[in-house]
Amino acid sequence: MLSITILFLLIAEGSSQNYTGNPVICLGHHAVSNGTMVKTLTDDQVEVVTAQELVESQHLPELCPSPLRLVDGQTCDIVNGALGSPGCNHLNGAEWDVFIERPTAVDTCYPFDVPDYQSLRSILANNGKFEFIVEKFQWNTVKQNGKSGACKRANENDFFTNLNWLTKSDGNAYPLQNLTKVNNGDYARLYIWGVHHPSTDTEQTNLYENNPGRVTVSTKTSQTSVVPNIGSRPWVRGQSGRISFYWTIVEPGDIIVFNTIGNLIAPRGHYKLNSQKKSTILNTAVPIGSCVSKCHTDRGSITTTKPFQNISRISIGDCPKYVKQGSLKLATGMRNIPEKATRGLFGAIAGFIENGWQGLIDGWYGFRHQNAEGTGTAADLKSTQAAIDQINGKLNRLIEKTNEKYHQIEKEFEQVEGRIQDLEKYVEDTKIDLWSYNAELLVALENQHTIDVTDSEMDKLFERVRRQLRENAEDKGNGCFEIFHQCDNNCIESIRNGTYDHDIYRDEAINNRFQIQGVKLTQGYKDIILWISFSISCFLLVALLLAFILWACQNGNIRCQICI
């Protein structure tokens, strides 16, 4: 927020012995030797006294764990954390605003795939918590708690913590399983379950007896039925088989039915879904530090009050809008017209029409004067404050127009959804183009308004002084007035503060004006008289020449012959 402390500065210079002419008072505005270029609606390069950068280009090389809660998945992605893979125990009961997935995350259990991976990932991320509720499932005449050498814990064969691998009983039986669970709670439940795909028919019968197997999971509104796809696949962690994981959401009052004759990877419970939570996920290698920031990107955290940033299009939290421009400057001061280097303070006194004043440090507008008591400079409180009041809060208003608590994450799609991904990227690129254009236009509008306001206040101040002085002074055309009466420092002060009474000095001013005009004419009158004098001189010269010729002819000194 722009704030300027207005102080009246009066610098007395010289003495009455150094100046004997008429008092002069000039109006001017602040200037600096090197201003800042900004863009307006009508000009790409306008120099102003001060401007503020609106685009943040700096970021912290770390993620800030406050005030947003961050959970580092480390070697586990969010899906492995939900399944309960080895090495993911640190995620049990974890709660987050932003789940940090690392590019180095790896699978550590039986090789698997999730046909609707991104949807499951999004549901888990948005939920903001791993709140797993264990349930009792009555499976009949089958073996439970199957394990695999691909899933080691403490060098022992194991399996996903939150899943139960069902196989045939010791009596080689895998009878039809038909199990129903009712959601009698007040929240939605997320069940994650799987289907095992053996690599051979022999493995199928050795594990489940029945070939083919089948898994069907139903609710009142949906049904998913899967027949295992038996076949050899590349070996991963010593396994050629695969598990496909699916998920089902059961709303309050709904039921879920598990029906299988083999190959079911059964849930041990469900995840409690929080419909009010609005968490998200960020894939980045940036470490978590000890800083404080409400905005995170895949390149690090941003701590700024600026409304725009060009660090990353992937941002989470209370972040500036991403724009393509590297710089957008908001004018917070008036148009800058630097003072000529060769001009002293009063070497050739001039007002705002010719240039600005670099010595006017305590205000935007002010006065310079020269009289019998010396010279001086003073800032004008009223006009400066009027301009500040209109500009003050401009940055805050601009932030309000652009600030929105939102997150923009990089969306991922399966390979079969390539066209959707291309369309999504096109839409995101279009949104960024529009925001970049809107940001540039908005800043240009604000800059135009700022310059117009400051120019207007200068004109208002000049008009106020002109109305005060009236015929007691003459406008010199450069922002200065020559005063035709004695005007000491008190008189000058009355002009500045608006208490000047022209009637007091009127007679003296008129008398002095007539005396001065008898000797000293303004530049406009000089030009007219010079032209008249030149014309008369030419006329007299021609008349004398003709008179001489006539006289000479009469005396016989000149003979004229006209031949036809």
From Swiss-Prot:
Membrane association type: Single-pass type I membrane protein
InterPro entries reported for this sequence: Capsid_hemagglutn, Hemagglutn_HA1_a/b_dom_sf, Hemagglutn_influenz_A, Hemagglutn_influenz_A/B
An example molecular function term from Gene Ontology annotations: host cell surface receptor binding
PTM description: Palmitoylated. In natural infection, inactive HA is matured into HA1 and HA2 outside the cell by one or more trypsin-like, arginine-specific endoprotease secreted by the bronchial epithelial cells. One identified protease that may be involved in this process is secreted in lungs by club cells.
Protein keywords: Clathrin- and caveolin-independent endocytosis of virus by host, Clathrin-mediated endocytosis of virus by host, Disulfide bond, Fusion of virus membrane with host endosomal membrane, Fusion of virus membrane with host membrane, Glycoprotein, Hemagglutinin, Host cell membrane, Host membrane, Host-virus interaction, Lipoprotein, Membrane, Palmitate, Signal, Transmembrane, Transmembrane helix, Viral attachment to host cell, Viral envelope protein, Viral penetration into host cytoplasm, Virion, Virus endocytosis by host, Virus entry into host cell
Signal peptide location: 1-16
Residues bearing a lipid moiety (S-palmitoyl cysteine): 553, 560, 563
Disulfide topology: 26-480, 64-291, 76-88, 109-151, 295-319, 487-491
Superkingdom assignment: Viruses
Chief location of this protein within or outside the cell: virion
Any Gene Ontology biological process: viral budding from plasma membrane
Keyword Transit peptide: no
Record topology, Extracellular segments: 17-527
GO cellular component labels: host cell plasma membrane; membrane; viral envelope; virion membrane
Annotated site residues (Cleavage) in this chain: 343-344
All ranges on the Cytoplasmic side of the membrane: 549-564
Ranges that cross the membrane: 528-548
Residues carrying sugar: 18, 34, 178, 310, 497
Localization: Virion membrane; Host apical cell membrane
Quaternary structure and interacting proteins, as annotated: Homotrimer of disulfide-linked HA1-HA2.
Family: Belongs to the influenza viruses hemagglutinin family.
Function of the protein: Binds to sialic acid-containing receptors on the cell surface, bringing about the attachment of the virus particle to the cell. This attachment induces virion internalization of about two third of the virus particles through clathrin-dependent endocytosis and about one third through a clathrin- and caveolin-independent pathway. Plays a major role in the determination of host range restriction and virulence. Class I viral fusion protein. Binds to sialic acid-containing receptors on the cell surface, bringing about the attachment of the virus particle to the cell. This attachment induces virion internalization either through clathrin-dependent endocytosis or through clathrin- and caveolin-independent pathway. Plays a major role in the determination of host range restriction and virulence. Class I viral fusion protein. Responsible for penetration of the virus into the cell cytoplasm by mediating the fusion of the membrane of the endocytosed virus particle with the endosomal membrane.
Anything else known: Major glycoprotein, comprises over 80% of the envelope proteins present in virus particle.
The protein's name in its UniProt record: Hemagglutinin
